[in-house]
């Protein structure tokens, strides 16, 4: 799914109105119907609803929503905010329609009026500005937003929380911003929804589809994408009846250190679960028994050193390499990693301590094989590129690092992002807070190795690995819960995640 900036969404609206064709007021009606369906499915009629309506099309959505909910039997109060003399044509039409519904109480509020209190029992709907405002909220309207935020009511924002900057960091926004519990956005997720710094404004968000013209969506060139099942399913390769283990590649995992052999175990098992024909784990010799016992399906290559990675094995037999989980940053390991980079042209997966070593030796980075994959968490990424002023700045640094070095950067988080050498960036839709547990990243590294070994392009491996990793985590959370979820639970659900992509049921939502 494409993530359109606000100016492109406006173009999509205009294109739809012109080419469907459909009137602006009818497109607004379509959006309000989707909102109404969500409210009726999630909010009981026993809860009265208070809608704050602005003077633009976001306000028009609010007036139309109030009318539809009143017709369903909800108790509706609307507060029409008179911060200007102008009202958009479609908003004016829905304002007049709402006025004709006797069951709706409409209160006009202007800059000189005392603000009425917000009853505690009401669910508040923010239909003030949505995504249409690009300047900070000040003055009279700031008082309205502040009053809503200071209440303890549930707040539902339409399209985007009012005052929220969708396409730039809100760390530079000195105005008031609605702090929503739920945000119902139209057709596409907004770019700003995907960053931790904005969670307190956006809350839980959902995309409501309002039928914007598919020709525009297909043709518009966009760099940022939001990964859904439909994006990933076509990438899966069908297995041949007469294939054998050699068909699906041989992955080399260089991992593990004294006290951290579990990282190597998790990654090796995940690599096999992700479909690699063979996985060899190159580990310090002290870990041999652990690996052979914990993952008997994997082969073991023992390092000359008992506790550290000190020398890479012959690389000629392998289709893909991953390095880093539990490795440590000993000087021996640093030297061995440098030689590894010099002695292969295979795209590699760099994780954990391999990234930390490169962070200490940045002059090595230009020699990393093109199309390699980096999988840092935010702190590891900071060691590579330095501090960022905000989440948007960090995303720009991530994209620039990928472009400059011709690599893929998977920045792990709630919406794990994949920055590609061509400038595109993919944000993940799967995963959950239960995956914030030790070893989760090692599982991802193993999955990436297993997928790469099968001959997938690194970009495909990144997309499939990240999406399937999160999906396996979602299945694990549904079985064990967030608190009890451990990394090996994610591994146990990799097969089920693959089945989701390879076996679409009739009538299933893609």
Segments predicted by a language model, with ranges:
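Short, solvent-exposed loop/turn segments at secondary-structure boundaries
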Residues: 90, 136-138, 169-170, 385-389
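N-terminal small/polar loop signature for handling phosphorylated ligands or for N-terminal nucleophile
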Residues: 66-149, 289-301, 311-313, 317
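Internal gly/pro-rich beta-alpha loop/helix module
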Residues: 121-123, 128-222
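A structural motif corresponding to the C-terminal end of an alpha-helix
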Residues: 102-104, 150-153, 404-407
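Short beta-alpha junction loops
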Residues: 82-85, 161-162, 354
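Short acidic loop-to-helix transition motifs that present clustered carboxylates
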Residues: 111-114, 162-166, 191, 306-308, ...
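Small-residue (G/A/S/T)-rich helix-start motifs and N-terminal tracts that mark the onset
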Residues: 1-80, 88, 182, 193-347, ...
